[in-house]
Amino acid sequence: METQLQSIFEEVVKTEIIEEAFPGMFMDTPEDEKTKLISCLAAFRQFWNGLSQESHEQCVQWIVKFIHGQHSPKRISFLYDCLAMAVETGLLPPRMVCESLINSDTLEWERTQLWALTFKLVRKIIGGVDYKGVRDLLKVILEKILTIPNTVSSAVVQQLLAAREVIAYILERNACLLPAYFAVTEIRKLYPEGKLPHWLLGNLVSDFVDTFRPTARINSICGRCSLLPVVNNSGAICNSWKLDPATLRFPLKGLLPYDKDLFEPQTALLRYVLEQPYSRDMVCNMLGLNKQHKQRCPVLEDQLVDLVVYAMERSETEEKFDDGGTSQLLWQHLSSQLIFFVLFQFASFPHMVLSLHQKLAGRGLIKGRDHLMWVLLQFISGSIQKNALADFLPVMKLFDLLYPEKECIPVPDINKPQSTHAFAMTCIWIHLNRKAQNDNSKLQIPIPHSLKLHHEFLQQSLRNKSLQMNDYKIALLCNAYSTNSECFTLPMGALVETIYGNGIMRVPLPGTSCLASASVTPLPMNLLDSLTVHAKMSLIHSIATRVIKLAHTKSSVALAPALVETYSRLLVYMEIESLGIKGFISQLLPTVFKSHAWGILHTLLEMFSHRMHHIQPHYRVQLLSHLHTLAAVAQTNQNQLHLCVESTALRLITALGSSEVQPQFTRFLNDPKTVLSAESEELNRALILTLARATHVTDFFTGSDSIQGTWCKDILQTIMTFTPHNWASHTLSCFPAPLQAFFKQNNVPQESRFNLKKNVEEEYRKWKSMTDENEIITQFSMQGFPPLFLCLLWKMLLETDHISQIGYKVLERIGARALVAHVRTFADFLVYEFSTSAGGQQLNKCIEILNDMVWKYNIVTLDRLILCLAMRSHEGNEAQVCYFIIQLLLLKPNDFRNRVSDFVKENSPEHWLQSDWHTKHMSYHKKYPEKLYFEGLAEQVDPPVPIQSPYLPIYFGNVCLRFLPVFDIVIHRFLELLPVSKSLETLLDHLGGLYKFHDRPVTYLYNTLHYYEMCLRNRDHLKRKLVHAIIGSLKDNRPQGWCLSDTYLKHAMNAREDNPWVPEDSYYCKLIGRLVDTMAGKSPGPFPNCDWRFNEFPNPAAHALHVTCVELMALAVPGKDVGNALLNVVLKSQPLVPRENITAWMNAIGLIITALPEPYWIVLHDRIVSVISSSSLTSETEWVGYPFRLFDFTACHQSYSEMSCSYTLALAHAVWHHSSIGQLSLIPKFLTEVLLPVVKTEFQLLYVYHLVGPFLQRFQQERTRCMIEIGVAFYDMLLNVDQCSTHLNYMDPICDFLYHMKYMFTGDSVKEQVEKIICNLKPALKLRLRFITHISKMEPAVPPQALSSGSPAPQANQVPTALPVTQ
């Protein structure tokens, strides 16, 4: 091949000797040139056509090499003309020629003439290269230019500029050689943010990149760097807050020139989240940290160090480190964060200590030094035994800096808890010294002189063998010697002995023959807080070991109340999670269960129900799964244990947070049975109600009408297999539409009330006719026998006023588990009986019998009976009768009302502050004993039956507390049925005080007002009553101003029915300002300080958000008006809203409005429509400026030139940034049905792109279907605008954005619909967008009028499984 090529080309370029001797003196005529060219080309064509396809590239490369081997510019020029003609006549492919020329090793800038001629040829033929080829050539040319040094002779610059001209041609928008989006991507790869382009390119490249700033802006959320989340402990992963773990930058899509602040590390965001209590899971989600992969994260380390420095600064200004003060809470939280992140090796301890030293050096901050050493002691004492001494020695460097005293530091008052902080440095030295001795290290550190008195005090205390609990000496010794077993045994032994009891003394517990070890006073919280994590771990380990040991030996003596309460208190510490709650759920519970230690199992479940706080959702769902397994075991078929298991399960189900439900239940999709009850219809109904509430509050089903393809489907189907049931229409109407549809499709035939009555009569006849006692007992307690026995007992009491001994024996034989079905049937039977009762005397008799069955005979507990009644699915009149029975049971006899009022009066919900809970608990149970084994009936029968069943220990529970989760359900059922509103008010008046003991009263109120928003419209009095009853129940246990605002309490609580209070703008401003100040960490904050470990909410912002939403939903103002008033806080000029802080206010509005029901936030859509229809966007003459400046909120705001369109844009971004994907999924419909017919101008179109563009990334990650619909809508709008405009001024930014959308998000998923639309665009637009369709000859696919009618584009049939990033 090479020989043939050589002969062809050498023939053309050969010259006579005389020509070479006198170059430039001889010239070929143009005709001769042309003849040569034609003959050369003819010979080459013949050769080329004979070549195989595979050899083409090699051939072209040889030609290029041959040309570059020539030294005469004339020859090179001639040969290049040959190549150009070969390309122009279609003989050679232009891409192959260009690539071979530019990739040639011999093309060097030093050969300036070859360089100039080569790029001139490329410029001539590059127009024929396909767009992907042009992209590749651009990349190579840019790299080639980089080889030119910074200084070259000015003589050669002109020649070198030929390369710049090629680049200029490629970047020329009107030439459209490739999508400009490809070009900017290649340029930004070589010249990222902050790197200057090569001098040869001058401003050509930077000007081109600048044309993409509008596209970058379209894809940016306004004020994104100022938006902050509210941290909750739901475990829900939110993509909005993800950051790059190496740089802390936002993960921006595409290599666009975004605004500078978006490229900055988002330290403020991470720092804010780190400052929030219970934020560690969110930090891990944000940075993609996985506990399994121990990866160090230096940026996280830096922020933790900065937080410690901030705490040191705060301590410097605080007068005293008081109990529960801001500074104390901050140090407590810091200690927890530090341990977690260092323990999982996301942060390195020695690096952090050295960094702290560096940042504190020369600052003179020493007031907080003891607290800092306390934080460091936590980690050191717990990990020094497993790590090298050298890792901890930097602490001594910090000591030298912070403890400059030459004299001895005096011993603090050890009666105060903060004395443990003052001793922290001495404790650290003791641990370091102990480690050095154990390692036989030469690094022995003598005790610093300033710590001598502290050290001597500890040594002396250790010699004192009888330690008292009245000061903090025990805590000090535990902290100092936790790594020295000889010395540690004494103080730890003293603690343990206090709570275990001495093994001889006994105290009674509620119920018959139930005794416990006689230690009733738990360790106080401030003592536990004064122990290091290491000491706390030893204590909790000791307790768990003891419990397991007692479970194995099946001890007849119950655990000491002090031990149980102390164990509960220790479980609140997140720092000891592995031995704490994790050990409790994963080891202790299963071990106790295997040992059949039912008393201890009952105790653990009671603890979980009444003493646990902020337990992570996966632990709670794991426990629920354990409980369903437990319920199926024969040994738990015992009245008290069965009741406890069901009550605990009910609490777990109803207490699931709305944002927790989906992440937790999707973990069980392969086996939904594990989290569902195989036999309890009530528990499964409770789960469905929780599911309905959660999907409503999170707007999960918004925009969809079926559960097909969702995580709910298998759960619902499994429930219907286990416990088939129906729902009353008034309950069903409150469900989200897809759930309503599911239950309508899966309707279960109900047994008629008439049949039930007939069956009861039939069984009663049998009962009366049978005489053999054994036969009766066998017959009526048999498995599979109709569950009508309670109905028979009712008949007996109605007719004979008494129940025989056989009745008692049957009840006993039926067993706790089977009896639930009897209660269920009895509930239906009662409704029938009361419905058909003649009233008057007969009705009173019915009421009396029913109350006797609960209170006199103890046949069924009140909470179970009411739960069953509340969960039945009666309609109309029968539903009202059912609720009437509930009201009678709760209020008619004094039994329950007295129990409630006495319990509420005598007790406080703040168990962590009490030392005498056990005494109060026992006196209450003495006055109102729990009777769970039909005791009343056993005493009444003739002859009386002695009770055999010993009680399992009860430490915390009673009928009032057991009733609380049932009361939650009762209130909801009453809300659904309009005619029983008055009865609900009566219940709240008499029993509302119980909410004082609800563990999540505000959340319950929030969920209720949110879920029943439609039910409660125009029922302002009832809303107010509900809020007043629940919030008012806590008035004695909460400081003033903890929840509702003073303005609300003054005006709304006292408003008259006929004259509701309508708040002014200033009210809304103050309410939003309260959340703004809370999130900014203002001190003192708008809300009183509290110990977040025992609070309903994990941190101040979560509390502020929920109480604000409750107050707004409780107003006697329609949701739409409240929503508009919230938007007006920033959209209208408000004197109370500071300009310099406007994005923080928008952030707060976004958080609040998205946490409210749909009518509140949907008003934003109306605002957007009014802006889009405003003259500034519809008339081209109204605004002569640059639209991208008009939409740039930050620039407009800073220059005081803001317009309503930029404000609305920024506010919409803040709202949508905080929205759930369910709320966002209404955007496609909003675009196609509302905005598409309105958008006619370029400004309107750009405004819509600005609005929705930044959220494509979330749609791609969370709901691809919506992304595809939005993609099509964007093209439909473009077609509208194109047809309504004579010329588009901003065609390039529009096209750039559409290319960005294709390559970053939609890929080819919208190709089919989009091709039809592009075919109908005007030529200039069609030319620019031609690479999206890949149609070379674009003919209109449909007549233009068919697509200009504003109808939505056809939907994509399927979502692509993988979206190409580049193509």
From Swiss-Prot:
GO CC terms, sorted: core mediator complex; mediator complex; nucleus; transcription regulator complex; ubiquitin ligase complex
Ranges annotated as biased composition (Polar residues): 1346-1367
Entry keyword Protein biosynthesis: no
Pfam families: Med23
Location within or outside the cell: Nucleus
Record keywords: Activator, Nucleus, Transcription, Transcription regulation
Region spans: Disordered: 1343-1367
BP GO terms, sorted: positive regulation of gene expression; positive regulation of T cell extravasation; protein ubiquitination; regulation of DNA-templated transcription; regulation of transcription by RNA polymerase II
Function of the protein: Component of the Mediator complex, a coactivator involved in the regulated transcription of nearly all RNA polymerase II-dependent genes. Mediator functions as a bridge to convey information from gene-specific regulatory proteins to the basal RNA polymerase II transcription machinery. Mediator is recruited to promoters by direct interactions with regulatory proteins and serves as a scaffold for the assembly of a functional pre-initiation complex with RNA polymerase II and the general transcription factors.
Family under the similarity heading: Belongs to the Mediator complex subunit 23 family.
Oligomer status and interactors: Component of the Mediator complex, which is composed of MED1, MED4, MED6, MED7, MED8, MED9, MED10, MED11, MED12, MED13, MED13L, MED14, MED15, MED16, MED17, MED18, MED19, MED20, MED21, MED22, MED23, MED24, MED25, MED26, MED27, MED29, MED30, MED31, CCNC, CDK8 and CDC2L6/CDK11. The MED12, MED13, CCNC and CDK8 subunits form a distinct module termed the CDK8 module. Mediator containing the CDK8 module is less active than Mediator lacking this module in supporting transcriptional activation.
Entry protein name: Mediator of RNA polymerase II transcription subunit 23
Lineage: Eukaryota, Metazoa, Chordata, Craniata, Vertebrata
